[in-house]
Amino acid sequence: MSGGEQKPERYYVGVDVGTGSVRAALVDQSGVLLAFADQPIKNWEPQFNHHEQSSEDIWAACCVVTKKVVQGIDLNQIRGLGFDATCSLVVLDKQFHPLPVNQEGDSHRNVIMWLDHRAVSQVNRINETKHSVLQYVGGVMSVEMQAPKLLWLKENLREICWDKAGHFFDLPDFLSWKATGVTARSLCSLVCKWTYSAEKGWDDSFWKMIGLEDFVADNYSKIGNQVLPPGASLGNGLTPEAARDLGLLPGIAVAASLIDAHAGGLGVIGADVRGHGLICEGQPVTSRLAVICGTSSCHMGISKDPIFVPGVWGPYFSAMVPGFWLNEGGQSVTGKLIDHMVQGHAAFPELQVKATARCQSIYAYLNSHLDLIKKAQPVGFLTVDLHVWPDFHGNRSPLADLTLKGMVTGLKLSQDLDDLAILYLATVQAIALGTRFIIEAMEAAGHSISTLFLCGGLSKNPLFVQMHADITGMPVVLSQEVESVLVGAAVLGACASGDFASVQEAMAKMSKVGKVVFPRLQDKKYYDKKYQVFLKLVEHQKEYLAIMNDD
């Protein structure tokens, strides 16, 4: 500012709770990350398909990373705090103490994780009701949503958990409550995972029909009867106790939270794309699909009017971008699947030794090894006779069938490093083919998508990014800040502080294009063939099932 004092810089803290770690960032008004920290969190798997965490362990990790990113900063310059987290279920008693979600009665483990599939029987019964709320989750509710998990708790842990419970939080809402003492829920969590309607509120008939009439009787006090849009300022901001825990000042604005994938969408989808030669530059923001890819992947598309896509969650009003309807496709395991395939291979120990010797990650080494063995052909052509169906944890979208299994065809007796690298490539391609499958379902229902915006851990893998471009035939935009989910969380804090007039304004000013990866259109014919095989795989799996179940 000429002729006057420059305004002091304003900062925001974004906190992201993922599946295996908590991460935090200090972000400025331009969306630039100034400091970053991460801290692992514990996961328990007491039995198959049961995945649990501890809310106390998660909060402690939030405190560690937040203190780290604000070291050396004038705390008066920190204007807002935003949280995002996985859509896991936190259970507390009436005094806000943890309750066990396990048969062992261990109250420390009071979180049913998002990827937990214990409630298969319950979700099947819910889907048999054909209740009208199901049309807003693609016609079929997922076992990963909260209603089946709540029903499982009532039916299996009545005495030690259900009867004592006072509060059921989505994890993002637990964090904002812990920071402010305000039990209001985020519209994002309730609309996306709990069947809440932004227009009509809770549907009493649904909860009564599935056997959870308890919530209706207490006016939904246990699951949320005050609902705020993401980015809204909560109460009086950070409480003195939470401020001490986090190393911040009391009263700092705290935002109504987002689910982690939605924070990623917020962090990328509104970027200014001018000057990059992208077709979406002259198109509305509804032409963009945000793909948030980490342990699992979520595919976020927005529209001005509601679009109902079979097998794809939504439409959810204002669940990510205010004023827009959101459809959310997804794949239950992506990063986790790649790890599973690579780490389970006989050549994995050799890979570890060679990658360590080169000071590379195992995936950087595999990518360079693929370049070595591809010779004159494009790297993707190495899988001409190896094909993978990636639903090792069921299909979330667009088939919405949790009974589907993974498939690999084209295996040989070879178990060397070349074999591992090609299996890794085929797995990455299968995930990208799954994205194409989801896009085609969304476009058939009325979406018009031209550009992918990728973020999350897998977006740091150049092979993963290029395969998504080649297989979908669409350009892939990567953010200037690779930690887009944390930028999205910081956008929430910025909105809560009042420094921006709207979420849209904060999105536009805090998210920037870093790199664009264009599809290699000369390879289109090959990937069209791979896609035909991909669709045949699931068709054949269903045929095998029918044969084996035939009396």
From Swiss-Prot:
Q: In which pathway does it act?
A: Carbohydrate metabolism; pentose and glucuronate interconversion
Q: A GO CC term? A: cytoplasm
SUPFAM superfamilies assigned: Actin-like ATPase domain (SSF53067)
Please list the tissues where expression of this protein has been recorded: Expressed in kidney, lung and small intestine and to a lower extent in liver and detected in cerebrospinal fluid (at protein level).
> Which UniProt keywords are listed?
Amyotrophic lateral sclerosis, Kinase, Neurodegeneration, Transferase
Which Pfam family, giving just one, matches this sequence? Answer: FGGY_N
Recorded E.C. number(s)?
Answer: 2.7.1.47
What is a single molecular function from GO for this protein? Answer: D-ribulokinase activity
GO BP term, pick one: pentose metabolic process
What InterPro entries does UniProt report for this protein, alphabetically? ATPase_NBD, Carb_kinase_FGGY, FGGY_C, FGGY_N, FGGY_RbtK-like
According to its UniProt record, which reaction does this protein catalyse?
Answer: D-ribulose + ATP = D-ribulose 5-phosphate + ADP + H(+)
NCBIfam families assigned: 5C_CHO_kinase (TIGR01315)
Q: Which family does it belong to?
A: Belongs to the FGGY kinase family.
Linked pathology = Amyotrophic lateral sclerosis: A neurodegenerative disorder affecting upper motor neurons in the brain and lower motor neurons in the brain stem and spinal cord, resulting in fatal paralysis. Sensory abnormalities are absent. The pathologic hallmarks of the disease include pallor of the corticospinal tract due to loss of motor neurons, presence of ubiquitin-positive inclusions within surviving motor neurons, and deposition of pathologic aggregates. The etiology of amyotrophic lateral sclerosis is likely to be multifactorial, involving both genetic and environmental factors.
What's the stated role of this polypeptide?
A: Postulated to function in a metabolite repair mechanism by preventing toxic accumulation of free D-ribulose formed by non-specific phosphatase activities. Alternatively, may play a role in regulating D-ribulose 5-phosphate recycling in the pentose phosphate pathway. Can phosphorylate ribitol with low efficiency.
Know the name of this protein? Answer: FGGY carbohydrate kinase domain-containing protein
Gene name in the database record: FGGY
